[in-house]
Amino acid sequence: MEIFIHYTSLPENKTLADVVGELNEVLDDSGVVSGGEENRLDLDLEDENINPKYAQLAVKSYLQKVGFPKDTTLEIGGMEIGIYL
């Protein structure tokens, strides 16, 4: 399963490499940042048996903690969810 992070800007004092590395740590063995394009990061959940809600909550918490903008969204299965909702 894939999760897409749609963002308009990175938090202050964070590079894209910082965010990718930290997200890989957050996902641990359950997933990895697999790519992306302009203003989007693609996350691949490697274990189909893991409930995607847990990964969503972990990623959402990380994005809030490091200060992503309020218009940042997570897309799962075609549905976009704001990270501050």
Please provide the spans of the model-predicted regions.
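Short glycine-/aliphatic-rich beta-strand segments at the starts of folded cytosolic domains
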Residues: 1-13
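A structural detector for beta-sheet-dominated domains
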Residues: 6-8, 46, 77
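Structural alpha-beta junctions
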Residues: 25-34, 64-70
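Short, solvent-exposed polar/charged micro-motifs at secondary-structure junctions
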Residues: 42-45, 81-85
